[in-house]
């Protein structure tokens, strides 16, 4: 990476953080409003005895809630990551990092600290790293292992963000040979691989390919939350790149709604994280009833993180209380039981799923 590329990468990270904090980057239409869990008027449970803990890739988590990959790669993100990591450690949930490409390719101690601070703040938490699928084609296994070692990661997320790349003036739009790269790394890496989208969802067909490639988990990151094409549209406007702005705006609402993507992915893989517009513990409960193992949130943790770890801990506590309430009124004493709860599918999500199923 050249010095110019290095500066560009770091500046892009800072741009993204500022835009997410200051601009309208939310979409709608996760599909969770179309999912109705069947109420149990006689749950025969002690609320205080409800156990929301899970085993995830051999690690015990206190609740099926993930702090999704967001930040890293700019010194402005260090304190945010410190707060998120401390909260993950205190509450016993999982946390993902943003792309570690900058940490691998830039010779900058402040950039590196934006990543390493996470393990320093959370020595025992489940922390997973992050690289792009496009980078896997370029890196040998030793380079990928460096990303793992950088934060003593328990797993590595491989993100798929080709729509975002297509809307960036400097984007990498060569999508070839990524499945082979993912399979190569899945076979050789020392930790499990989680493949995640970045706001546009994973289809059943793609989930099937990834399952065959040997990945350990899928994170659907569907439509309905933060829109990265929308974020890039703001960047393009500031960079006087009207065509990229137009494309980013046009595809702002593009993707598979999170609920539908979850349904498709759980039919192909037995370890699925539902993210993308997840905002409450009830959303997490619905995702689990659809078959997900856990639910993930990113942007809802960003503002609390700027206020410090206690604010993040409070937000996690709210989510767990909402989840436990949903478990109580569905008669679910455990997450395994919540996965078996009956639900009714309505509206556009039902239409989407029925049409997709009938076309197979």
Curated annotation (Swiss-Prot):
GO cellular component terms given for this protein: cytoplasm
Localisation: Cytoplasm
Gene Ontology MF terms in the entry: FMN binding; isopentenyl-diphosphate delta-isomerase activity; magnesium ion binding; NADPH binding; oxidoreductase activity
Record organism: Halobacterium salinarum (strain ATCC 700922 / JCM 11081 / NRC-1)
Name of the gene this protein is made from: fni
Keywords, sorted A to Z: Cytoplasm, Flavoprotein, FMN, Isomerase, Isoprene biosynthesis, Magnesium, Metal-binding, NADP, Plasmid
Binding site for FMN: 69-71, 99, 130, 196, 226, 277-279, 298-299
Assembly and oligomerization: Homooctamer. Dimer of tetramers.
Binding site for Mg(2+): 165
Enzyme class, broadest EC rank: isomerase
Official protein name in the record: Isopentenyl-diphosphate delta-isomerase
Chief location category: cytoplasm
Swiss-Prot/TrEMBL GO biological process terms: isoprenoid biosynthetic process
Swiss-Prot/TrEMBL cofactor(s): FMN; NADPH; Mg(2+)
């Amino acid at each position: 990476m050249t010095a110019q590329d290095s500066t560009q990468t770091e500046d892009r990270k800072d741009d993204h953080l500022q835009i997410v904090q200051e601009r309208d980057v939310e979409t709608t239409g996760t599909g969770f409003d179309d999912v109705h869990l069947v109420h149990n008027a006689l749950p025969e449970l002690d609320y205080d005895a409800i156990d929301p803990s899970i085993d995830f890739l051999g690690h015990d988590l206190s609740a099926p809630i993930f702090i999704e990959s967001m930040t890293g790669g700019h010194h402005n993100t260090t304190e945010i990551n410190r707060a998120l990591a401390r909260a993950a450690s205190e509450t016993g949930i999982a946390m993902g990092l943003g792309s570690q490409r900058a940490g691998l390719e830039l010779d900058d101690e402040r950039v590196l600290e934006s990543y390493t601070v996470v393990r320093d703040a959370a020595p025992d938490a489940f922390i997973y790293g992050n690289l792009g699928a496009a980078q896997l084609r370029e890196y040998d296994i030793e380079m990928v292992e460096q990303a793992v070692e950088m934060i003593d990661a328990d797993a590595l997320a491989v993100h798929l963000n080709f729509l975002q790349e297509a809307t960036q003036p400097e984007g990498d739009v060569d999508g070839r040979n990524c499945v082979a790269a993912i399979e190569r790394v899945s076979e050789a890496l020392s930790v499990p691989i989680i493949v995640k989208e970045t706001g546009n969802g994973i289809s059943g067909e793609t989930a099937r390919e990834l399952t065959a490639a040997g990945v350990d988990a899928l994170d659907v990151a569907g439509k309905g939350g933060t829109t990265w094409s929308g974020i890039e549209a703001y960047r393009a406007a500031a960079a006087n790149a009207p065509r990229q702005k137009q494309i980013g705006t046009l595809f702002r609402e593009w993707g598979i709604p999170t609920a539908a993507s979850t349904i498709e992915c759980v039919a192909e893989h037995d370890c699925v994280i539902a993210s993308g517009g997840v905002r409450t513990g009830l959303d997490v409960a619905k995702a689990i009833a659809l078959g997900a193992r856990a639910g993930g949130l990113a942007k809802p943790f960003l503002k609390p993180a700027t206020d410090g770890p206690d604010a993040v801990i409070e937000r996690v506590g709210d989510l767990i209380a909402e989840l436990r309430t949903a478990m109580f009124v569905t008669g679910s004493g455990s997450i395994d039981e919540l996965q078996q709860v009956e639900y009714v599918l309505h509206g556009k999500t039902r239409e989407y799923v029925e049409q997709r199923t009938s076309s197979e």
